[in-house]
Amino acid sequence: MQKEPTKKAAGKRNAGANPPRKLSRAEKKQIAEVIRQARGDGKAHTAQQTIPYLTMYPDGICKVSEKKYSKSIAFEDINYQLAQADDKTAIFENWCDFLNYFDASVSVQLSFINQGTQREQAEKAINIPAQDDAFNSIRTEYSDMLKNQLSKGNNGLVKHKYITFSIEADNPAAAKARLSRIETDVLNNFKVLGAAARPMTGYERLNVLHGVFHPEGEPFRFDFSWLAPSGLSTKDFIAPSSFQFGEGRYFRMGRKIGAVSFLEILAPELNDRMLADILDLETGVIINLHIRSIDQTEAIKTIKRKITDLDKMKIEEQKKAVRSGYDMDIIPSDLATFGNEAKNLLQDLQSRNERMFLLTFLVVNMADTKRKLENDIFAAAGIAQKYNCALTRLDYQQEAGLMSSIPLGENLIPIQRGLTTSSTAIFIPFITQELFQTGAALYYGLNALSNNMILCDRKQLKNPNGLILGTPGSGKSFAAKREMTNAFLITDDDIIICDPEAEYFSLVQRLNGQVIRLSPTGKGIDGKPQYVNPMDINLNYSEDDSPLALKSDFILSLCELVIGGKEGLQPIDKTVIDRAVRNVYRPFLANPDPANMPILGDLYDELLKQPEPEAARIASALELYVSGSLNVFNHRTNVELSNRLVCFDIKQLGKQLKKLGLLIVQDQVWNRVTVNRAEKKSTRYYMDEFHLLLKEEQTAAYSVEIWKRFRKWGGIPTAITQNVKDLLSSREVENIFENSDFVLMLNQAAGDRAILAKQLNISPQQMKYVTHTEAGEGLIFYGNVVLPFVDRFPKDTELYRVMTTKPEEVSEA
């Protein structure tokens, strides 16, 4: 208002000057063009202008428009499809509560982005580089097997899930305060659902946008510190080389052609599998659900008005019927149906904790060629048709559709469908978890639901202890061999095997490991003497200052096993043994030379020197193992125990010696673990036929101790057994189950299935995967993740021949 006088004053000052000349038509046109360009015509002229946001802040808040701000959270999948019926219902109800949390002032966008550009990264994760040793042929073979398995699944498709919520605010500070509160509540809701979730930074959100706009997989290079010196905006770092939207039914983005469609929800009842089935497509598909809550009071008023309108129409129809001489109860069926549905809807909103939502369901397909794109769209449309819905192309709205399909919280498509809470929640964003870790992750087969590879690292678990359970012939030993081979090839871990059935010789020999055959004759596989000294000790044997205390405890267990009897060792017996142990180790502790290492005979001699009659009794019991026919353990160790791969073959030990042999092997493993701990090295210990260790009180107690303490010392024990009942034989032994975060469960007998279902809370749907299944099929439990798996190892390989335990295949090999 104040600028007008100024303009007039300027006019008076110019009155005495030459009158301005008139502009030519061409000049007027040129100036109008400059003004039009300066003002803008509302259309995007660059790829950057197409992307509908103003500013992305480093903390993850995005200023979408002048008064609209959004934030995103990335969340992980949970096992919904295989959950127990009660768990499924609980997940669904919690998801309904989650949606009801958002009021009309918050817009929500669920984004599911399947990016098919990560094949190189997946191959990098499974690549086993060659080394300067004798195992490169095996590395190549194992690596080829992994690549072949990768090609069967869609691990090249990385599936991401995001929730974006947006609000109106006057300034960034006000937006930040409210978005922060919503973020906290959303994270708590995901915690209730059992889904891992994390807020996204500005960099992470830009990285997601870059991934959508560069489906070929170009790396994202950006840092917020680059913006000020360069004068560029964040859009310059994420925009593709070009957008083309002129074709009406398609868009082009860089070298890709794509199309955006929306889902017409026509079905009277919706199914929770539809979203899952579309996401299961092995194509680069992007699905977005824009959800906006309607104010509850407003929704109820609207429905009441509708009911009133329908009642008016009903009265008019009845009047018409009376005038025409018809029965007034005969009214159009649609009118009656709509009236009943409206009343049911009103009842839901008023008394059943339901709210009304407006939903826009968008599907983006992208491909290299138009033919491939049409095939992908046809596949997605077929799934929609299966559930009585329709996938309809957004003709001449491709730009708005694509920009509504990036996780910014902006919906530019006005096609919305009104749904109640439970109808909206049926598009549940959970299917099945995936397990594809990188680094030192080992291969365990393919996910039976998604066909994706299962790669995981037990060291990442809070408790890496493991169990491999299955009936004879289900593939237990093979699974253990595959894991230890994989660990041998890609880690520096030491591997020790307790082998009661002589099943591991071929594999250990091929990997240049050491097989120690413990037998009554003391002869190894090559006929030469092989001895292991049960009195071996190293100065790291215990985590406190006295390694002797723990070693004394082991020798007490050994003597208890030797003496036997229901009552075992009496207190005075234990005192005598402990004294003798301390005396016999004194020379070695004073001068820790291997030549000073005591043997059982030294303990026997020391016991005879003690004055108590109990000492003579214990010495007499030991005599059989010192100078008698079972004296195989009365020698200093003469075998190489420092090999990376050591297998203790105890098949030839008789009944009397086997119990002792099992205990001595466990002690040797403990020795090795303590040495490796000092070197910061992990030790994997495999116990086949684990039920044998649980039959004797001493070995069972030692096993429980291993399960409790190995983790702190870098040990990773794995028990392999077919006898699940033995694992539950006592409360103490049951701790082994509770202290195992890794379970590989193969086919199970009926009785064991019932026990395991109760112990591990396995649903009937999950139990199908361990019921009458083929070898190499089952369930993998990794922490809180439970997945069905299938492992088909190629038989035409050298590794298969040295790993198989099938008699006919062993003889062929």
Model-assigned labels for residue ranges:
Residues 760-813:
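Conserved P-loop NTPase
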